[in-house]
Amino acid sequence: VFVAIVLILIVVAAGFGTILIDKYSYSKERADLDAYFGLMEENAVAIILQDEQAEEYARIWDGICYFDFATVHKYFNDRFYEDRQESMLIYTTPDSIIRTQIGSSVLETSLGESEDVGYTIARYEGDVLYVAADYVKRYANFSYSLYEAPYHMQVYTEWNERQVADITKDTQVRYQGGIKSDILTEVKQGDSVIILEEIENRTKVKTRD
C-alpha cells in the first residue's frame, strides 16, 4: 500500500510539474502570416505605409508590384489620368505630357521622346486599372521594399528619425505580449529593430522584413 501511494504521489507530482512547465514556457507556435497580413489572394501584397498596414493591397504580376489607380491617387500622386476611351495612362509635367498605352511597356512624351521601361507600365484586372509601383515612383517621392513569403511591402513617404535597438541575443518576435503569443519571426543577435512603442514589460518593434 505504501509503495502504491508513493507511486501515485510521484505520478501526480510529475504531472503537476508538466503542467507548470507548460504554463510558464514560451509557445513554439508560429503565426499564420497570410492571416496576419489579411492576404486573401495569391498575388495580393500587404502595404505597410510608414508603420501601419494600409487597408489597400497591391498586386504582383510577373515579379512586378502594382498599385490600383485609387491607391496611386490616395497616397502618392493624383496627377495621373486614366483615359479609358483611348486606353491610355497619362501624366503631365510642366514641360511635357507622358502617355503610355495600357498593357504596354513603352512611354511616349509630347516632346517626341519614347522609352521602353522593360515592364508593363499599367494593366487592367477586370475594370480596375493597376499601375506599376516603379513607374509611379518616377513621379512621386516614396521608397519601397518588397518581401516574399508572404508578399508584403514596406513603403515610406516620410523619413523621420527613428529609435533603433540592437538585439543582444537570438529571440523571437511575437504577435502580442505574453509567452503564449504566436511567433511572427526570428531575430538574431546583432540585428536591429525599430522601437515603435514601449508598454510595461513589452516593446512593440518593427523588424527589417
Predicted regions and their residues:
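A short macromolecule-binding patch
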Residues: 165, 207-209
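Short aromatic-glycine-enriched beta-strand elements
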Residues: 200-204
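Primary recognition of N-terminal secretory signal peptides and signal-anchoring hydrophobic helices
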Residues: 2-199
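Noncatalytic linker/hinge segments flanking ATPase motor cores
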Residues: 190, 205-206
